[in-house]
């Protein structure tokens, strides 16, 4: 097992040096990025990303995208955000902050420049009103970075939908 691990490390080093020489975006080590927010359920997403980083024996980074709306956040939301940042630090994440109003672009650009292999985000339970609605954060990220693994964790308990079955009547 030790020799297999050493062989894998050697292959990683060779691949990494080849990646640097060819200026490629492919990385061999796992680097998990979690997106921070003031959502009440963001703690669940942070814990999930931490478990992934531990399972993959990878680097764990937590990213907050500060937009121009940040100063207008309520004190309750700011406190929740601070609590989520503190939780990520406790779980071993390196905290990073980027600035910009296009959140999806900021996340994917940070991921590309930092060698992130997996992004963990929360899924809002907000429903779209119609087909031509603005794309969600996740949809934008998928377009901007098709080569990254993006894990979407539901913000709240998933709603189970019942499949309607046709009622059969028995004729007597």
Sequence positions of predicted segments:
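Structured cytosolic domains appended to multi-pass membrane proteins
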Residues: 1-161
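Cytosolic-side membrane-insertion boundary helix
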Residues: 159-172
